[in-house]
């Protein structure tokens, strides 16, 4: 049995909140750089170049990449042989509170969605815990801005809709979102399960490295087809995708 102090959890979450808002993971940086190098449309290329300059400035000055510093989504893989010395959830919330305060990050979270009173420290966080074997504890902080979060959709498809119905729903979702999620975007797609489970799967999918395709060849091909359809001219996105 391994014991981890609540203070260590707090310190880690606070650091990750700041890093996640001021740095991009290497796979995302590489994807953005590749996009700006290959983009043929001058206006789009100029936009990507501006995003790249903004990213460099944020890194050099330790400033947020975006003014929307989002809701802190904290994903935890917690080993069954780990004992947390103290309150685990309280430690995470304290880490978010400290990270958003020490990092001078915008506080966006309200205590009640209808009364709209800001909590003033960006808590509570959204905490997702997955139990795994062993004595490890892996914490990932993903700030989720609501420009993209508010464009999320769920659809209960009929069996008869098949894979074509699924692909059409994904492409239509991106089309309807337009510029609201602040492109370029990363799609987190969940398929199957209950209403709540599929939303969890979609959120978790955002953590996958961008440069690693799905290990299942069927879904890897589906990813390629969706990417091609989404990036196609608008007038073509209603067509049946190649299979």
Predicted regions and their residues:
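Conserved small/polar residues in nucleotide/adenosyl-binding loops
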Residues: 237-243
């Amino acid at each position: 049995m391994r014991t981890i102090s609540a203070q260590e959890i707090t310190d880690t979450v606070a650091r990750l909140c700041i890093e996640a808002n001021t740095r991009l993971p290497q796979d995302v940086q590489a994807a953005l750089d590749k996009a700006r190098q290959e983009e043929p449309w001058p206006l789009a290329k100029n936009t990507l170049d501006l995003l790249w300059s903004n990213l460099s400035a944020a890194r050099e000055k330790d400033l947020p990449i975006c003014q929307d510093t989002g809701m802190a989504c904290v994903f935890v893989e917690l080993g069954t042989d780990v004992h947390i010395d103290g309150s685990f959830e309280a430690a995470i919330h304290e880490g978010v509170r400290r990270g958003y305060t020490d990092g001078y990050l915008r506080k966006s979270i309200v205590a009640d969605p209808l009364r709209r009173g800001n909590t003033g420290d960006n808590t509570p966080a959204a905490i997702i815990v997955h139990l795994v074997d062993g004595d490890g504890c892996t914490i990932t902080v993903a700030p989720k801005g609501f420009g993209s979060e508010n464009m999320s959709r769920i659809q209960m498809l009929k069996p008869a809709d098949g894979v074509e119905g699924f692909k059409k729903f994904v492409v239509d979702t991106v089309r309807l979102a337009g510029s609201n999620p602040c492109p370029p975007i990363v799609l987190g797609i969940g398929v199957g399960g209950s209403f709540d489970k599929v939303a969890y799967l979609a959120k978790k999918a955002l953590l996958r490295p961008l440069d690693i395709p799905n290990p299942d060849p069927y879904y890897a091909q589906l990813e390629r087809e969706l990417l091609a359809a989404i990036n196609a001219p608008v007038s073509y996105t209603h067509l049946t995708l190649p299979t």
